[in-house]
Amino acid sequence: MAQIFNFSSGPAMLPVEVLKQAQQELRDWNGLGTSVMEVSHRGKEFIQVAEEAEKDFRDLLNVPSNYKVLFCHGGGRGQFAAVPLNILGDKTTADYVDAGYWAASAIKEAKKYCTPNVFDAKVTVDGLRAVKPMREWQLSDNAAYMHYCPNETIDGIAIDETPDFGKDVVVAADFSSTILSRPIDVSRYGVIYAGAQKNIGPAGLTIVIVREDLLGKANVACPSILDYSILNDNGSMFNTPPTFAWYLSGLVFKWLKANGGVAEMDKINQQKAELLYGVIDNSDFYRNDVAKANRSRMNVPFQLADSALDKLFLEESFAAGLHALKGHRVVGGMRASIYNAMPLEGVKALTDFMVEFERRHG
């Protein structure tokens, strides 16, 4: 079978080594004669999976001891509700920074539970889309927290600055598409959440990192399944968790540790992004309309100068083993999502195809 490179934005490509191990263990996991999908989540075998996954995740991100790690349901959209329901406390407003599609989606959901103070950080610089630097973000004095999204998958926009708003500002961040791709200082955040289906594992699992002093503030109307305190008190097993997704994510964490951890991923991700953006920037045939300072390393949208060639580009790239390159319907064009599991070899295959396609159709 020819090598296939999956550039989907999520559910995304998983490491080949992880898939092979899961395949080998599918019908006989740990010598039990059953699949990990069939064992009790409260049995000692799966408890070990859960404990190892949390330990490895903490190691990868150097999560401080005063932070809890929760393995949840509901995806990023579930957390759009969970964040205000858990950490508003007795306040009624929160600061939300709008830099793209997913930040705006979080704002829309938050309006059900509080009055968001929305700061529009989107700007245009020399005709390119960009984000105002954090020093220009206007925050209110009475907000329970400040929320932003460091990486916008649809817009291809990244905010790589580390927040530094003082110890009194609780920062909540949607890291769904950039978690584990580069080192982060967890201590600068009150809440970090990430849907698993991009850089962690398969869809169905969501990881939350929450500072322990923020527990115990949930609104009385908060569903138990979204209550951080209840999840923490029950070891993330208030109800039956997505065990297979948890197991696979644990395998991904071990794969990451065996391959140099987050620091090594950071280097490789930079190489991949430079290679792909380099081909785009050195061509009049392709274009990207995001300012270099805010370009995402995870999601690279690009357009062809002649959109009439879009269909042919997608057909030929698919035939060449380069899958899921169609851009989001909101933006159009193409989009290459190059998360941790995408090897440099895959990006090289894409850029070689792009150069050859331009040669034939430019």
Swiss-Prot record:
Any single Pfam family the record assigns to this protein: Aminotran_5
Its annotated pathway reads:
Amino-acid biosynthesis; L-serine biosynthesis; L-serine from 3-phospho-D-glycerate: step 2/3; Cofactor biosynthesis; pyridoxine 5'-phosphate biosynthesis; pyridoxine 5'-phosphate from D-erythrose 4-phosphate: step 3/5
| N6-(pyridoxal phosphate)lysine PTM positions | 198
In this chain, pyridoxal 5'-phosphate is annotated as bound at: 76-77, 102, 153, 174, 197, 239-240
What EC number(s) would the UniProt record show?
A: 2.6.1.52
Q: What's the top EC group for this one?
A: transferase
Q: Does the keyword Transferase apply?
A: yes
Listed under catalytic activity are: O-phospho-L-serine + 2-oxoglutarate = 3-phosphooxypyruvate + L-glutamate; 4-(phosphooxy)-L-threonine + 2-oxoglutarate = (R)-3-hydroxy-2-oxo-4-phosphooxybutanoate + L-glutamate
Keyword check for Ligase: no
The record's Gene Ontology cellular component field reads: cytoplasm
Which SUPFAM superfamilies does UniProt cross-reference here? PLP-dependent transferases
The UniProt annotation places L-glutamate binding at 9, 42
Q: Which Gene3D superfamilies match?
A: Aspartate Aminotransferase, domain 1 (3.90.1150.10), Type I PLP-dependent aspartate aminotransferase-like (Major domain) (3.40.640.10)
User: What keywords tag this UniProt record?
Assistant: Amino-acid biosynthesis, Aminotransferase, Cytoplasm, Pyridoxal phosphate, Pyridoxine biosynthesis, Serine biosynthesis, Transferase
**Family annotation (NCBIfam families):** PRK05355.1, serC_1
Q: Per the similarity annotation, which family is this?
A: Belongs to the class-V pyridoxal-phosphate-dependent aminotransferase family. SerC subfamily.
User: Can you say what this protein is called?
Assistant: Phosphoserine aminotransferase
Species of origin = Escherichia coli O157:H7
Q: Which gene encodes it?
A: serC
